[in-house]
């Protein structure tokens, strides 16, 4: 059982092995880790198909197939030789208590950041990003958001716990600056007056990767960046295992290239969310999420000398 909490561990097998077969450390705060992976098995804020609470386990399980590559293509180095990454297992909270989950996740994140660690988190539904943003903003101040998704999640429906409202709430709390934030892959209805730059899926699919990345860098500038990737940004052909799939999304190839292009940004926190393995086929959604998470670590490792 993870020592991040004391209730019954509802994560099933998630705490049995680490992402990419990395070492498990249930007390990461005093470790020498650079980056700490945390699973958040929560899907109570889902409006579509539930099941995202099993996402962390699915991502970890399929990631074992990625662990063998030491000089990863096209990086040609081993991230593990440049970054000290540990997996602290899943957040434990009273199952069914969304408020407790939010408070415990924020407290866990604040403690890690105060200890000089950085976080890569696995959802869970996308609501888990909000307590993570609250913790990161306390440590880094107002941030830019780089957000991959089929939905803007800026919907003002008055619900406190909803995976479609985080980026309506976050600017109002002063956590992120919409004028320096960008949402990539959007292909559903959204409010055009909320300050975010929206790069919809049609234009992202039609433009070159280099062109999109250049615009993202111009928008973000030198602000600290929180990177969040909702797996439904990908087309359902590449990621069927999610709660709210939307046709017309990005290919996995384009998404990976876009993430790689973010390596020069000042990224201070990252997450991958909304994997729901019950709807997956041959683990392709979990594999896409695990690969994107690995690429996120590689863009951090690329900043470090050998």
Curated annotation (Swiss-Prot):
GO terms, molecular function: agmatinase activity; manganese ion binding
Alphabetical GO biological process terms: putrescine biosynthetic process from arginine, via agmatine; spermidine biosynthetic process
SUPFAM superfamilies, sorted: Arginase/deacetylase
Residues noted as binding Mn(2+) in the record, renumbered to the chain: 126, 149, 151, 153, 230, 232
Pathway: Amine and polyamine biosynthesis; putrescine biosynthesis via agmatine pathway; putrescine from agmatine: step 1/1
Gene3D superfamilies: Ureohydrolase domain
Cofactor(s) this protein requires: Mn(2+)
The entry's keywords: Hydrolase, Manganese, Metal-binding, Polyamine biosynthesis, Putrescine biosynthesis, Spermidine biosynthesis
TM regions (residue ranges): none
Record-listed E.C. numbers: 3.5.3.11
Top-level class of the enzyme under EC nomenclature: hydrolase
Keyword Hydrolase in annotation: yes
Catalytic activity: agmatine + H2O = urea + putrescine
Pfam family, one: Arginase
UniProt family annotation: Belongs to the arginase family. Agmatinase subfamily.
Function according to Swiss-Prot or TrEMBL: Catalyzes the formation of putrescine from agmatine.
The protein, known as: Agmatinase
């Amino acid at each position: 059982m993870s020592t991040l909490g004391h209730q019954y561990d509802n994560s099933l097998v998630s705490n049995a092995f680490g992402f990419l077969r990395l070492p498990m450390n249930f007390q990461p705060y005093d470790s020498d880790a650079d980056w700490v992976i945390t699973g958040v098995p929560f899907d109570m804020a889902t409006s579509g198909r539930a099941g995202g609470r099993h996402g962390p386990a699915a991502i970890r399980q399929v990631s074992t197939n990625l662990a063998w590559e030491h000089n990863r293509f096209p990086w040609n180095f081993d991230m593990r030789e440049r970054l000290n990454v540990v997996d602290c297992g899943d957040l434990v909270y009273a199952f069914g208590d969304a408020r407790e989950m939010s408070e415990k996740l924020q407290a866990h994140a604040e403690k890690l950041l105060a200890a000089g660690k950085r976080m890569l988190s696995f959802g869970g539904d996308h609501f888990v990003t909000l307590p993570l943003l609250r913790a990161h903003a306390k440590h880094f101040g107002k941030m830019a958001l780089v957000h991959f998704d089929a939905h803007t999640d800026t919907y003002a429906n008055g619900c406190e716990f909803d995976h479609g409202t985080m980026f309506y709430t976050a600017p109002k709390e002063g956590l992120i600056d919409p004028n320096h934030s960008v949402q990539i892959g959007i292909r559903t209805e959204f409010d055009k007056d909320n300050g975010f730059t929206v790069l919809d899926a049609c234009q992202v699919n039609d433009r070159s990767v280099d062109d999109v990345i250049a615009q993202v860098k111009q928008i973000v500038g030198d602000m600290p960046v929180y990177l969040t990737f909702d797996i439904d940004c990908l087309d359902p052909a590449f990621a069927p295992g999610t709660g709210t799939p939307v046709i017309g999304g990005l290919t996995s190839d384009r998404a990976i290239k876009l993430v790689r292009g973010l390596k020069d940004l000042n990224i201070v926190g990252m997450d991958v969310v909304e994997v729901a393995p019950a709807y997956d086929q041959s683990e392709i959604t979990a594999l896409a999420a695990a690969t994107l998470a690995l690429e996120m670590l590689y863009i951090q490792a690329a900043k470090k000398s050998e």
